[in-house]
């Protein structure tokens, strides 16, 4: 692919803006309570096993920790993004939707799976059974679709920075989010229709209930689980692997391009230069790029001004390289966590749909409880990966809550020494007339 030098600089600048945002938000993975209370309730109630106190205690402890972290983390994300107007970017709008679905998933999944599992009885009634299964499925679906949307948005911002600007707007993001919620509520309508309480007799001859999602036939049950496996795991997983794989490849090529540019700069003293200012170096997610300006600064190449400019260029190049490498590592983590959290529960559901007896025999009780717990973990990991690892978000958090020390408004502070260097550059430029420099942006 051959581009003019001016176009290459513009594309590279846009790409690095997105890399910054990626590192700042650090997505993928999402939550999950598997679609169905029936999973845990069936495995744990249909064939009760002798309870072990230490297993119950460990289960309660782990569920409580994950629940508290999920509620606290997602609530903080929602609060910061709503109250801080400066953080309402396109990607943050998707992250807000992700936090809402994660919070809803946590509230509707964990208590209504853990309590019946411990009591060996679904005590909440038929209406709650239908409602919780419906919101469980919807929250899982919305979370997954949000992750896919974030991966595609990042792909467009990094790999197609010029073309994607047409549709990377807040209004477009809101339309996509509204569509994902409407689609999810529509897809999951079978849950309130076919979820019911099923009575059974426990070992002590007492009658109890379990909340189960039962379709009229085994063929329909198998088709439904296959459908969910495709749209909520396999296809989203493939899309994210491809999108993040292409992003990583693009960034790797950018690293090689930077290395070649650095080598050329050593061999030939440059007469012109441009640099991409980094507002955050932990960036996981890129800001809207500003078209780079081509400045003829021969007059500034002498004395302390030239020395300072050369140091800034070198620092910016190093920051770009570090940011790209961090994004690649972050994307690998996102994909690995997505499959780690989702694969066990979807595999268990598919197994149960096609071989109920064998699945219940091997997964009943503790195994399915901890498989579900693993899927829940993603709802508390998402805020950490996508938000709290983002320097701008942390600054926004401290600005939102007065009780926290506030080092400055988000998006103002950058690398160590960068703010001072930026002021120095502006001061140096102000000493010279615009007749000594070209400020026209390169053609797209």
UniProtKB/Swiss-Prot annotation:
- Specify the protein name: Cholecystokinin receptor type A
* Function of the molecule: Receptor for cholecystokinin. Mediates pancreatic growth and enzyme secretion, smooth muscle contraction of the gall bladder and stomach. Has a 1000-fold higher affinity for CCK rather than for gastrin. It modulates feeding and dopamine-induced behavior in the central and peripheral nervous system. This receptor mediates its action by association with G proteins that activate a phosphatidylinositol-calcium second messenger system.
Q: Where in the cell is it found?
A: Cell membrane
Reply yes or no: does the keyword Metal-binding apply.
no
List the residue ranges of the region (Disordered): 263-288
For the keyword Disulfide bond, the answer is yes
Transmembrane stretches, by residue range?
A: 57-82, 93-119, 131-152, 173-193, 226-249, 330-350, 366-389
Task: Enumerate the Gene Ontology biological process terms.
Answer: animal organ regeneration; axonogenesis; cellular response to hormone stimulus; cholecystokinin signaling pathway; eating behavior; feeding behavior; forebrain development; G protein-coupled receptor signaling pathway
GO CC terms: endosome; membrane; plasma membrane; terminal bouton
Report a single Gene Ontology molecular function. Answer: cholecystokinin receptor activity
Q: Which residues lie on this side of the membrane: Cytoplasmic?
A: 83-92, 153-172, 250-329, 390-444
Q: Which UniProt keywords apply?
A: Cell membrane, Disulfide bond, G-protein coupled receptor, Glycoprotein, Lipoprotein, Membrane, Palmitate, Receptor, Transducer, Transmembrane, Transmembrane helix
- Tissues expressing the protein: Pancreas and brain. Also expressed in the gastrointestinal system and vagus nerve.
Q: Provide the residues annotated with a glycan attachment (glycosylation).
A: 25, 39, 205
Q: Which residues lie on this side of the membrane: Extracellular?
A: 1-56, 120-130, 194-225, 351-365
Q: Which Pfam families match?
A: 7tm_1, CholecysA-Rec_N
Family named by the database record: Belongs to the G-protein coupled receptor 1 family.
């Amino acid at each position: 692919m051959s581009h003019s030098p001016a176009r290459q600089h513009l594309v590279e600048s846009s790409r690095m803006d997105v890399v910054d945002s990626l590192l700042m938000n650090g997505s993928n993975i999402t939550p999950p309570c598997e679609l169905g209370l029936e999973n845990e309730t069936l495995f744990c109630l249909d064939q009760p096993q002798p309870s072990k106190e230490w297993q119950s205690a460990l289960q309660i402890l782990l569920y409580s920790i994950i629940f508290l972290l999920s509620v606290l983390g997602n609530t903080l994300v929602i609060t910061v993004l709503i109250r801080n107007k400066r953080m309402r970017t396109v990607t943050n709008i998707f992250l807000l939707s992700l936090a809402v679905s994660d919070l809803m998933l946590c509230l509707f999944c964990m208590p209504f799976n853990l309590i019946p599992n411990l009591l060996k009885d679904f005590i909440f009634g038929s209406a709650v059974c239908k409602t919780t299964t419906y919101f469980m499925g919807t929250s899982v679906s919305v979370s997954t679709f949000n992750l896919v949307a974030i991966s595609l948005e990042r792909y467009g911002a990094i790999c197609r920075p010029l073309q994607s600007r047409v549709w990377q707007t807040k209004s477009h993001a809101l339309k996509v989010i509204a569509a994902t919620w409407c689609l999810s509520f529509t897809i999951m309508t079978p849950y309130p229709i076919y979820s019911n309480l099923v009575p059974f007799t426990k070992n002590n001859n007492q009658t109890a209930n379990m909340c189960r999602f039962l379709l009229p036939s085994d063929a329909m049950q198998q088709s439904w689980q296959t459908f969910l496996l495709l749209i909520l795991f396999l296809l989203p997983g493939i899309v994210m692997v491809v999108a993040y794989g292409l992003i990583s490849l693009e960034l790797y090529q950018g690293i090689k391009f930077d290395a070649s540019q650095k080598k050329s700069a050593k061999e030939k003293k440059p007469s012109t230069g441009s640099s991409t200012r980094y507002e955050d170096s932990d960036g996981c997610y890129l800001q809207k790029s500003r078209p780079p300006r081509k400045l003829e600064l021969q007059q500034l190449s002498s004395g302390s001004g030239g020395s300072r400019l050369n140091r800034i260029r070198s620092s910016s190049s190093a920051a770009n390289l570090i940011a790209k490498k961090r994004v690649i590592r972050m994307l690998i983590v996102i994909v690995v966590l997505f499959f780690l959290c989702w694969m066990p529960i979807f595999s268990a559901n598919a197994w149960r749909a096609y071989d109920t007896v064998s699945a219940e025999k091997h997964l009943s009780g503790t195994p399915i409880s901890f498989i579900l717990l693993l899927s829940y973990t993603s709802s508390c990991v998402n805020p950490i990966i996508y938000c709290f690892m983002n320097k701008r978000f942390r600054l926004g958090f401290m600005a939102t809550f007065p009780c926290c020390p506030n080092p400055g408004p988000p998006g103002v502070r950058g690398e160590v020494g960068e703010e001072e260097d930026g002021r120095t550059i502006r001061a140096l430029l102000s000493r010279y007339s615009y007749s000594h420099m070209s400020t026209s942006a390169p053609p797209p």
